[in-house]
From Swiss-Prot:
The keyword Amino-acid biosynthesis applies. Keywords: Amino-acid biosynthesis, Arginine biosynthesis, Cytoplasm, Lyase. It comes from Listeria monocytogenes serotype 4a (strain HCC23). One of its GO terms (cellular component) is cytosol. Pathway: Amino-acid biosynthesis; L-arginine biosynthesis; L-arginine from L-ornithine and carbamoyl phosphate: step 3/3. This is Argininosuccinate lyase. It catalyses: 2-(N(omega)-L-arginino)succinate = fumarate + L-arginine. Its main location: cytoplasm. The gene is argH.
Amino acid sequence: MEKLWGGRFQGKSEAWIDDFGASISFDQKMAKEDLAGSLAHVAMLSKCGIIPASEAAEITAGLKILQEKLALGELEFSTVNEDIHLNIEKLLHEEIGPVAGKLHTARSRNDQVATDMHLYLKQAVAEIIQSLKHLRVVLVQKAELHVETIMPGYTHLQHAQPLSFAHHLLAYFGMFTRDLERLEESVKRIDISPLGSAALAGTTFPIDRAYSAELLGFSAVYENSLDGVSDRDFIIEFLSNSSILMMHLSRFCEELILWTSHEFQFVELTDAFSTGSSIMPQKKNPDMAELIRGKTGRVYGNLFGMLTVLKGLPLAYNKDLQEDKEGMFDTLETVQTSLDIFAGMIETMKVNTEIMEESTQKDFSNATELADYLAKKGVPFREAHEIVGKLVLECTQNGIYLQDVALSHYQEINPLIEDDIYVVLSSKTAVQKRNSYGGTGFDQIKVALENTKKTL
């Protein structure tokens, strides 16, 4: 089949080489955007008097036929035509004849593909933003149910201090809020039209770039044509933002994986988000959480792959940039699906509140409470820290916990200790009293929930 760019060439191409150079297997995802860009471009060509209105009408009608066929799944693409742009132009030629060749006036595939990617990413990021907003709602709803659910807080994966489970959930709410802000802020750098930049230097035709940008719903145009066709920062930024978002999902998934284990039993995932074993009948595995954790590395790989492709590229277009799409498509799908799966897991998981709270009774996470108690009685904190540390060692040697120590022994250690110490050492009191701003105290959690609901 004759190439649309074949005038310069005498030799025939070979199918296996065509296959290697073709991108239609993946860039056909942007067929809708490519058709939209072409419709805006031909409207601009007509408005500016670059092609006759009658020819513009023919081209427009042909493009709309292709849109209808695309919606019905009736368009067939070929690797012979390399990419989505040449495939659509060839299909348009079959629909309306030689006048289709005028569509590419004042346009290059360089600004065409960049336009497609901006359009595609803009819409896809908007969908991710909606899913992220939904996840934040789910977290707040779950947190409202567990303001007074006590759980161990950890450092080094060792019991540290007791927390409200709502406090733990709202920590992730904060992370996902920053993810949301990053994505929303990035849209202004996606929402820019490169159309009209042509190959790299602009065009001699009297085009109106602002008009085509307006038709496509862009807020601005690239001020520099060379930048317009060379820029892939908007994709890198999306991949970077996605990597951070997936990292947050992965951290939470790691905790869910631990919490569903027999050793923790803090939560139970519903059957829909779990799988069994082909040999061990008793198994209920948190596979969806594990997959999100695993797919995080995949998204990181897409980011580093894109950075590596671009690191040595001179301006403007190079064939290397064909490698900018699959990582973007893959990340979009991975992030979207991961968010939806994760929100479903959180929304439906069962929280074993009694087991959570019981686990704070069989540890020394109340040791700080005793140190603070002594400090409030006038004992220098470092001295109080030393006293409590020695008492913890003594308790571990005797197989008891701080709440099991007799009052008489406490008063031998320090006569300032009174019988209110047992209330102080309870995990619920420990959580309740931490009412510094942003702390885990119940009153602070309620304030935090009211504040978060204003941002939903």
